[in-house]
Design a protein with these regions (language model features):
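Short linear motifs at protein or domain termini
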Residues: 1-17, 23, 27, 158-169
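C-terminal effector-binding regulatory domain of bacterial HTH transcription factors
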Residues: 118-169
């Protein structure tokens, strides 16, 4: 079953589950967890730590719910995200591009959690994943167009008539 799961399914599941996780966390997160969450934002500004800080950000939020089923759900979705080659490739193609959007979205989630606003936290998390889903669609579309261009270039070479006008005197 794991091989049949794609990046869109994982991302949709993450959006739905982590949206609710964020809503719960807005009412349960403590000061120490908020401080650790803030540190992940600082770490994300350093390109060396983006992936690790991103994962930690989401884990801290899940852990702050104190709900083991939610924590396990988030952990399992991260395992799917990082253990299926196709999903890894799809995520890498969009997550490595522009960190500023992810950082901005994480800041919005952090602010909602800090203010204790469950609705705002859910909405901020949904916005974060909606952008990711759209970026995944853009990446898949670009790959498909590149493949079409590659195939057309092969055919162009196969069917084009060579220009012989320079050989005529």
């Amino acid at each position: 079953l794991q091989e049949k799961v794609n990046a869109f399914e994982v991302t949709q599941a993450r959006a739905l589950i982590e949206g609710e996780v964020a809503a719960i966390a807005a009412t349960t997160i403590n000061e120490e967890e908020l401080a650790r969450l803030h540190q992940t934002l600082v770490d994300m500004e350093n390109s060396q730590f983006i992936a690790a800080a991103d994962k930690e950000f989401h884990q801290i939020i899940a852990n702050s719910t104190r709900n083991n089923a939610m924590i396990l759900s988030v952990e399992n979705l991260w395992k799917l995200r990082s253990s299926t080659p196709e999903i890894i490739e799809d995520y890498d193609s969009v997550c490595s591009k522009d960190n500023s959007k992810t950082l901005s979205e994480h800041r919005a989630i952090y602010q909602a959690l800090k203010s204790g606003d469950a609705t705002q936290a859910r909405n901020a998390m949904h916005s974060h994943f909606n952008r990711l889903i759209n970026a995944l669609f853009d990446a898949v579309e670009t790959r498909a167009l590149d493949e079409i261009k590659r195939k057309n270039d092969e055919k162009r070479g196969l069917y084009s008539i060579p220009d012989t006008s320079s050989n005529i005197r």
